[in-house]
């Protein structure tokens, strides 16, 4: 659905070059929610602006829905952009227009007849849970409600792709959770492909099917969210989970997915006659999966066999130095 191929982007700033993107490539399958995370200045927002060609990359290609946007002439590019919606951290609503008027605005620009606009606006406000706010003005809305208006407006032209640039970073935790739940519902109901930029790991944990981690203009890690958590040395796992509370001989971290009901620790003590001390741990829901992580100290003559037993059962075992 979205393919970014070897993107490069350099800005000129006060007589010096600032490299924003260094050969960035990523693939977002149709119907997935794909997160791009990283620190400020990593190139995340530049990447997003290149996807819909608000910024044109110096080198590389952008493919959306089978079309190379970087090769399209202006009239065709404008038409292709109608299939790409975008929501922002700052809602950019028109204060002089009602909620319904804001949602209708892109349809007016596109020349959609008034009766059809009204039907579409009513449908969208129902979809985002604001059917009773059609006549309200932005100043009368909460931050979460304003973002819902922004989402409805982005969906007005019936896009197949939604780009989200830090859309929840200005919201409180409860409102953030409700917006993320809405995005997940839209993804499922409409088959919407969502590419979201965030610096919040809780966003990745809650809704992202796959993720790319960026740093200094490059993608340094990418893959399915759950698969990365089972990958030794994963940057994502280090970011999502607190570091082990202790280290030393026999101390390991155990990570497993969707195995919370298996009595793995009691099996170890029973089968291999080892002592297992639990030093810390957590059970989190990540991308719809139950992911567990324990830090334990295993001692006994058969401790190596016990660790092999865990590995054979798809538990990631990592020594804590």
Swiss-Prot record:
Bilayer topology term: Peripheral membrane protein
SUPFAM superfamilies according to UniProt: ACT-like, P-loop containing nucleoside triphosphate hydrolases
Record GO terms (molecular function): ABC-type D-methionine transporter activity; ATP binding; ATP hydrolysis activity
Domain ABC transporter residue range list: 2-241
Localization, UniProt: Cell membrane
Pfam families: ABC_tran, NIL
Record's GO cellular component terms: plasma membrane
Purpose: Part of the ABC transporter complex MetNIQ involved in methionine import. Responsible for energy coupling to the transport system.
The protein's name in its UniProt record: Methionine import ATP-binding protein MetN
Annotated organism of origin: Thermobifida fusca (strain YX)
Gene name, Swiss-Prot/TrEMBL: metN
């Amino acid at each position: 659905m979205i393919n970014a191929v070897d993107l490069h982007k350099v800005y000129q700033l006060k007589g010096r070059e600032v490299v924003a993107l260094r050969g960035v490539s990523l693939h977002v399958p149709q119907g997935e929610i794909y997160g791009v995370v990283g620190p400020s200045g990593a190139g995340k927002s530049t990447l997003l602006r290149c996807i819909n060609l608000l910024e044109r990359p110096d080198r590389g290609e952008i493919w959306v829905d089978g079309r190379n946007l970087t090769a399209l002439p202006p009239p065709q590019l404008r038409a292709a952009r109608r299939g790409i919606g975008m929501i922002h951290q700052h809602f950019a609503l028109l204060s002089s227009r009602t909620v319904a008027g804001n949602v209708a605005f892109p349809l007016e620009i596109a020349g959609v007849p008034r009766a059809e606009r009204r039907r579409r606006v009513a449908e969208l406000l129902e979809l985002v849970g604001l059917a009773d706010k059609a006549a309200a003005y932005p100043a009368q809305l909460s931050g979460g409600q304003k973002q819902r208006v922004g989402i409805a407006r982005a969906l007005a032209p019936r896009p197949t792709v939604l780009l989200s640039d830090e859309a929840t970073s200005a919201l409180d935790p409860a409102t953030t959770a409700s917006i993320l739940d809405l995005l997940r519902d839209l993804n499922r109901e409409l088959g919407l492909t969502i590419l979201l930029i965030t610096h919040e790991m809780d966003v990745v944990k809650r809704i992202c099917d796959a993720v790319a981690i960026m740093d200094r203009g490059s993608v340094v890690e990418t893959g399915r969210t759950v698969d990365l958590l089972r990958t030794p040395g994963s940057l994502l796992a280090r970011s999502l989970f607190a570091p082990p509370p202790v280290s030393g001989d026999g101390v390991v971290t155990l990570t497993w997915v969707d195995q919370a009901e298996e009595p793995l620790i009691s099996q170890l003590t029973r089968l291999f006659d080892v002592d297992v001390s639990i030093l810390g741990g957590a059970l989190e829901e990540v991308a719809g999966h139950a992911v567990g992580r324990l830090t334990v100290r295993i001692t006994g003559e058969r401790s190596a066999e016990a660790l092999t037993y865990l590995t054979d059962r798809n538990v990631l075992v990592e020594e804590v130095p």
